[in-house]
């Protein structure tokens, strides 16, 4: 029984964040801490006497081991990518050598990390030249990831994570007796079977960005693409990573094939991507959509609310899944 006020998700006051964090970093005097973006996590822009920085306050459900993995990966990638055009966001090191701080929040403990502000502009990947360059950058990122060893525990971007866990969340939200559940179970089972069959052919497996749809990657300064937001990075199929680029929505429909061809040509100019891997792209585009449905459900109770996730939302996904004709 709750007898005291509780919060599911708070927005922390910038003044509180400055009080908690400014003493830990050698980034100059804080002149401004501005609430910048509400996403899965909260983002603030910091302006100091030394320049601009980005502060991420992770949602309460993100555990310390998850943040430690992400920031360790970024630190290692900075070294591995030093000789190529591709870059990643830079976590700022605290005076005592730590990369993050655990904060008290109304809903519980939340973790905060500060990153150097990215210069440049977002490339919308609307032309062949940009897509070819972005393909090269994605390949350089995967090549660097192949040279990295991560010792922290981490989930895998496998069929269990993408499909099985998503199905469990969706069914839990809808209820076992909902008329769409039997179809969703059958669809998920068929999708799992197809993924396992494709994987048995020997797909490229390694550390992935995990959210490579372009919005987290296409920040460009000259010839440099900078990749950021590695929250979903883990071991997985590289075809899944590239499927997110293939499924990018912010491109004209009649240009998508030409842009994809340019992207994959750029990727293959740096590292191999087999015919088997490319043949799995469409399958992983479907898997990504099923995972997105599960992600929607995961944030209804404490972020987005149920209003926009009713029967119309469900029917949209069901009709989309039926259109794939995998069952």
Predicted regions and their residues:
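ATP/Mg2+ or Mg2+-diphosphate-binding catalytic cores
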Residues: 5, 292-327
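A cross-family kinase active-site recognition segment
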Residues: 95, 124-182, 205, 308, ...
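Active-site activation/catalytic loop segments of kinase-like enzymes and analogous catalytic loops
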Residues: 239-272, 287-304
